[in-house]
A protein has these predicted regions:
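Aromatic- and Gly/Pro-rich amphipathic surface segment
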Residues: 54-87
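Extracellular/periplasmic metallocenter environments
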Residues: 37-38, 73, 77-80, 86-135
Length: 135
């Protein structure tokens, strides 16, 4: 038994809810639904990790894997054979097309300065971030 705490998230052009209160050591199951019209990401990381991940996302756009409202999954599979990052198979992240659902189970151990963010190019920059308060 994982001892999960469930959290439902809706993504449009922001996260709902826009912040979380989490106890240190708690395991959360995030059920995420993209109810918007664009591709969005739900990524749990600190700011430095988000900054490091953003060029990978830009490369997915440049290679026409990541489109405004869809993901070319066939192209993603092919590119992932050459560059693992292009497969976007990160345990802390889910990349969702419009009307798509996904989930992440995450244990918040020794986490500092964690935020949930969308690293689709331009989205983080316009404030697509949810605050995570760990106590």
């Amino acid at each position: 038994e994982l001892g999960l705490v469930g959290s439902e998230m809706c993504i449009r052009d922001s996260y709902e809810p826009s912040s979380f209160q989490i106890k240190a050591g708690e395991t959360i199951k995030f059920e995420v639904e993209n109810v918007g019209e664009l591709v969005h990401e739900f990524n749990i990381a600190n700011k430095m990790m988000h900054m490091k991940h953003q060029p990978e996302m830009e490369k997915m756009v440049e290679n026409e894997i990541l489109l405004a409202d869809s993901i070319d999954k066939e192209k993603m599979k092919k590119m992932a054979k050459m560059d693992k990052a292009m497969g976007h198979s990160h345990s802390n992240s889910v990349l969702l097309e419009p009307n798509q659902k996904g989930e992440i189970i995450w244990k918040f151990d020794n986490a500092v300065n964690i935020e949930v963010a969308c690293n689709v190019p331009g989205h983080y920059q316009v404030g697509m971030i949810a605050k995570v308060d760990i106590n």
